[in-house]
Amino acid sequence: MIRPVETDDLAEWKRLRLALWPDSTAEQEETEVERFLAGYPSPTLMAAFVCVRPTGGLCGLVEVSIHDRAAGCETDRIGYLEAWYVDPDYRGTGVGRELVERAEAWARAAGCLEMASDTNPAYPVSPAAHEALGYSGVERFFRKDLR
């Protein structure tokens, strides 16, 4: 079952975020989820949805926001997948698709005509997962550390 994240989901939501971003800390993730639950930056600019396991607990999350620009996009109100994670034992079951479709519906209801997302080499399965849902790669970015 896909539903908006709730206050009671704090521990499981934090667990999913730590699985997605293992270089983060529990304290950082707790701060992030508490800020979100307190309404930051704004319920009209960001949403989070989770998938509930039939046996209890959560097995996936998607966090979506609204950006005014994104690589390859043509409009100034873009739904943006900020986070998308499904526990390994639920991958390939349709949970990831359902989560993204829920995020897209939220963005569409908020007036967005496009969706965007990003990924990096730390997530080798991510490009294929995005493409399976109709996303296409639009640009390649580079950076250089000047320190």
Regions found by a protein language model. Give the residues of each.
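Conserved acetyl-CoA-binding loop-helix of GNAT-fold acetyltransferases
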Residues: 82-86, 92-105, 128, 132
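Conserved acetyl-CoA binding element of GNAT-fold acetyltransferases
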Residues: 74-88, 140-143
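Conserved GNAT acetyl-CoA-binding A-motif
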Residues: 107-119
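Conserved beta-strand in the GNAT
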Residues: 50, 57-66, 80, 85
